[in-house]
Amino acid sequence: MNKILSLFLFLCLSISLNGQKLAPEWSKNATIYEVNIRQFTPEGTFKAFSEHIPRLKQMGVDILWLMPIHPIGLKNRKGSLGSYYAIRDYEAVNPEFGNLNDFKELVKLVHDNEMKIIIDWVANHTSPDNVWVDQGHKDWYTLDSTGNLQPTLGTDWWDVADLNYDNQEMRKAMINSMKFWLTNADIDGFRCDVAGWVPIDFWVDARRELDMVKKVFMLAEAEEIQMTKAFDMTYGWELHHIMNGVAQDKKKVSDLENYFKKDQYPSDHYKMNFTSNHDENSWNGTEMERMGNSYKTFAVFASLVDGMPLVYNGQETSLNKRLRFFEKDTIDWKKMDLVTFYSDLLNLHRSNPALWNGDFGSKPNFIIVDDKKKSIVFIREKDKHQVFCALNFSDKKQTIKIKSNLLNGDYNNLFSRETKKINSSFKIGLEPYGYQVLYK
C-alpha cells in the first residue's frame, strides 16, 4: 500500500512539474521580506530577531526570507565575520545566530503568526573547508589542472570552492541536506542563490523530492524562463534595472510598460519586484543613492504592478546606509518613518485580488505613459476589485487628465484614507515625485 501511495505521489508531482501550478496555495497573495540576521539587532541572533515578528506581521509581511543561516568557512574568509555564502556545513546553524533549537523556536513563532519562512540555499559552491572536503569528497568539487579546489570562474569569490554537478553522489547529498531543514525545522522553502549557475535538471529533481516531504515555495536568484520548471518565483532584475535607469534619466518611463508587454513567462509564475535587496544595498547603493527623490515612487510602482513585492530589512526606517557584508553593522531602528507607507502597500497587495500574484491576480493596464512628463498611470482589476495608480517620476508638479471607461464609482485613497467618487473622466494632481493610489 505504501509503495502504491508513493508511486501515486511521484506521478502527481511529475505532472505538476510538467506544466501545472507548482506554487503552494498560500503564496497566491503573499508578500516577502528579506532578513539579515547578523545586522537586524545588536545581538544578531534568532532570539533577538523573534521580537520583531509581530511587527512584521502587522506590516503585511507573509514570507520571511532569511539570508544563509549556516556556519561560515574559516579558510580564505573575507573580513572578520565572513560571507554568509561561503558555507561550512549545510546541516548546521551559524553559532553567531544561536543553535538549531533557537532556529526551530523561531520557525514555530513565525508559523504561530500565520507567516511562512524560507532560507537562503547556496548550491553552487561551498567554503573551501566545508565538511564535505573533510569527509574526503574532493571529487564533489570542480578541480583545477593540478587537482586542487577552485572558486567559481569569472568571480572574485576566493572564499568559496565550486561544486561539480557531474557528480551524482554530490547531487544526492545536496538534496538530502535540503530535506534536513524540512524535516528537522519545518521551514517552508528556499531562496536559491545564483540558481541559474546550477543545472536546471538538478533543480527539477530537487523540487520533486522536496515536494514529497512538504509542499515548498521556491525562489530562484535568476531571471531565466527555464527556471519556471522548478521554481515558483524568479527575480525581476530587468525591471529593477529599468527603474534605476528611469530614476537616473538613462531610461524612459515607456521602458517600464514595454517590460510587461514583452513578458513571456507562464501566467502562473511569479516575479519578485524590489527597489533594494542585500546585493543592491551593499554593493550598488541604497535606493536613495540609485533612485534619488523618486525612491518612494518606485516603491509604490514595484509594489502594485504585476509581481510579488520584496522589502529588504531596514527599508521601513528609510535606511540610507550600505550595510557592511563581512562585518557587524547593525540597523538603526529608532527612525521607523516608513512603516505605515510599506504597511499600506503590502496589506493592499494581500487584500485586493487585483494585485495577487501570477494568474491569481491581473496584468497592469497602462492607460497613460508619458515619456516627456515622466508619468505613468495604470489600472489593475480582477472581478469587482480594482486598483488605480498614478505616478510622477519627475521633479515637477503635474496635473494629469484621466479618461477611461474602466473607472467608475467610489474609491478609497490608500494614503489619505479619503473616499472619492470618480467616473470615466477626471483630473488628478501629483506633487514632484508624487503618487496616488485608489482602490475598491
Language model: regions and residue ranges:
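Short, solvent-exposed helix-loop connector elements
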Residues: W283-E289
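Hydrophobic targeting/anchoring helices
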Residues: K296-L304
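Active-site-proximal helices and loops of the catalytic beta/alpha 8
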Residues: T183, D193-F274, R290, F301, ...
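Carbohydrate-interacting/catalytic domains
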Residues: G19-W65, P71, K104, V110, ...
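Structural recognition of the beta-strand scaffold that forms the well-ordered cores
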Residues: T31-E34, I63-P68, I118-I119, G189-R191, ...
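Short, flexible loop/turn elements at secondary-structure junctions
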Residues: I37-T41, H70, N94, A123, ...
